[in-house]
């Protein structure tokens, strides 16, 4: 999995350890927008990284919103992944311009612990700022999922960011 230079930008999160501590209780989660760039031929890697966080957020009383481009989440997958079926909402077949605006509106409401949206293009600074402000207002997390093909990943050089955690060193 590749993490873009915009990943994990938030004015309220100063350290990885602090982020994990804040996620652990319901009303102390600060707004966060993170971009996850992953290879389309290796979706399991992304699931392994995000599922524990989504499971933890599923313990909150708020919803989880998935804004998917075409695919419909299967009930079986949601249940087998350990996510609360009664708290997962999905809206599919949104165009990219509607996905961004829908994410901003949903994050702002405070009704969702997490909003996950798929976008093919990188966010502009202004778009990221709008998302971050909405996440702060709604005390929610937003994940921008950006798939790349295996071919594009092999032929293109990424100036990425490696995230090291002092929890594991």
Swiss-Prot record:
Coiled-coil region: none
One BP term from GO: division septum assembly
Function per UniProt: Component of the SOS system and an inhibitor of cell division. Accumulation of SulA causes rapid cessation of cell division and the appearance of long, non-septate filaments. In the presence of GTP, binds a polymerization-competent form of FtsZ in a 1:1 ratio, thus inhibiting FtsZ polymerization and therefore preventing it from participating in the assembly of the Z ring. This mechanism prevents the premature segregation of damaged DNA to daughter cells during cell division.
Record has Cell cycle as a keyword: yes
Region called Lon protease binding, residue ranges: 162-169
HAMAP family: SulA (MF_01179)
Pfam (any one): SulA
Entry-linked PANTHER family: BLR3025 PROTEIN-RELATED (PTHR35369), CELL DIVISION INHIBITOR SULA (PTHR35369:SF4)
Segments passing through the bilayer: none
Keyword annotations from UniProtKB, A to Z: Cell cycle, Cell division, DNA damage, Septation, SOS response
Subunit structure: Interacts with FtsZ.
Keyword NADP in annotation: no
Region (FtsZ binding): 106-112
Protein name, as recorded: Cell division inhibitor SulA
Family of this protein: Belongs to the SulA family.
Induction data: By DNA damage, as part of the SOS response.
Site label Essential for degradation by Lon protease, positions: 169
InterPro entries linked: Cell_div_suppressor_SulA, P-loop_NTPase, SulA_CellDiv_inhibitor, SulA_enterobact
Description of post-translational modifications: Is rapidly cleaved and degraded by the Lon protease once DNA damage is repaired.
Species whose genome carries this gene: Citrobacter koseri (strain ATCC BAA-895 / CDC 4225-83 / SGSC4696)
């Amino acid at each position: 999995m590749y993490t873009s230079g915009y990943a994990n930008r938030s004015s309220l999160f100063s350290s990885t350890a602090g982020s994990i501590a804040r996620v652990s209780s319901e009303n102390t989660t600060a707004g966060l927008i993170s971009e996850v760039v992953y290879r389309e031929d290796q979706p399991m890697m992304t699931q392994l990284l995000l599922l524990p966080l989504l499971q933890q957020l599923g313990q909150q009383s708020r919803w989880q919103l998935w804004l998917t481009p075409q695919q419909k989440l299967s009930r079986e997958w949601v249940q087998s992944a350990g996510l609360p079926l009664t708290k997962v909402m999905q809206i599919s077949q949104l165009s990219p311009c509607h996905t961004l605006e829908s994410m901003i509106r949903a994050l702002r409401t405070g009704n969702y612990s997490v909003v996950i949206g798929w976008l093919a293009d990188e966010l502009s600074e202004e778009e990221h700022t709008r998302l971050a402000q909405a996440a702060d207002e709604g005390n929610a997390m937003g994940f921008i999922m950006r798939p790349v093909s295996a071919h594009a990943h092999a032929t293109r050089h990424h100036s990425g960011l490696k995230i090291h955690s002092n929890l594991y060193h």
